[in-house]
Design a protein with these regions (language model features):
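Hydrophobic anchor at the beta1->P-loop junction of P-loop NTPases
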Residues: 5
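P-loop (Walker A) phosphate-binding loop of NTP-binding proteins
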Residues: 8
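ATP-binding Walker
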Residues: 11
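Walker A/P-loop
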Residues: 14
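Post-Walker A helix-loop "phosphate-sensing" segment adjacent to the P-loop in P-loop NTPases
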Residues: 22-29
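ATP-dependent small-molecule kinase phosphotransfer cores
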Residues: 29-88, 101-121, 127, 131-140
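Small-molecule kinase domains that catalyze NTP-dependent phosphoryl transfer to phosphate-bearing small molecules
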Residues: 117-172
Length: 186
């Protein structure tokens, strides 16, 4: 089974995907890291690189090709990506959403995380992060609509949509696993 995760920044999708991959003993592929690495190679923040990608679809094409290759070569895995649900239609598609203010609080708490070092400029407050998240969300929405004609937040694109705003990571994980297990049993 292939499980694809998408969701709002700060929704807990990476943490949940890691836990699901560990529980199912599936490999996990994280396209966000690929994106961060591409930004780092260009000495850019994720915000800066995101703006470049909006104008240049060839950068997204590298990620798309990799997603298609993964689906062709692997039977069971977890993938985090804005577009995996589209490129792997047979996947179990999960979207995690979160209130913007809660997302900013979560991301601010993670700013010391090594993985987020080039996420954006050094922000000093949740309000600054909130503004950055709003810009990234708008940029993502416009980018995927422009390059693919996709509304990446349209809930009908997904098999499970879960609002994580008032849930602990354990509660999110349990709800996601309950859903996945219900599909495995069929």
């Amino acid at each position: 089974m292939i499980v694809s995760f998408n969701g709002d920044h700060g929704s807990g999708k990476s943490t949940t995907a890691k836990k699901v991959a560990h529980t199912l003993n599936y490999p996990r592929f994280y396209m966000g890291q690929m994106f961060r690495d591409m930004a780092k190679e260009r000495n850019m923040t994720v915000d800066e690189f995101d703006r470049i990608c909006k104008a240049d679809a060839s950068l997204d094409k590298k990620v798309d090709d990799y997603i298609l290759k993964l689906a062709k070569e692997n039977k069971d895995f977890i993938i985090e990506s804005r577009t995996a649900w589209h490129f792997i239609p047979k996947s179990l598609k999960i979207y995690l959403k979160v209130d913007e203010r809660e997302a900013a609080e979560r991301v601010f708490k993670e700013t010391d995380n090594e993985n987020r070092k080039n996420e954006s400029k050094n922000y000093n407050s949740e309000d600054e992060i909130l503004e950055s998240l709003k810009k990234r969300k708008k940029n993502d929405d416009e980018r995927y609509l422009k390059h693919y004609g996709l509304d990446i937040r349209k809930e009908s694109n997904y098999d499970l949509v879960l609002d994580t705003t008032n849930l602990s990571i354990e509660e999110v994980f349990n709800k996601v696993m309950e859903f996945i297990n219900s599909k495995i049993e069929k």
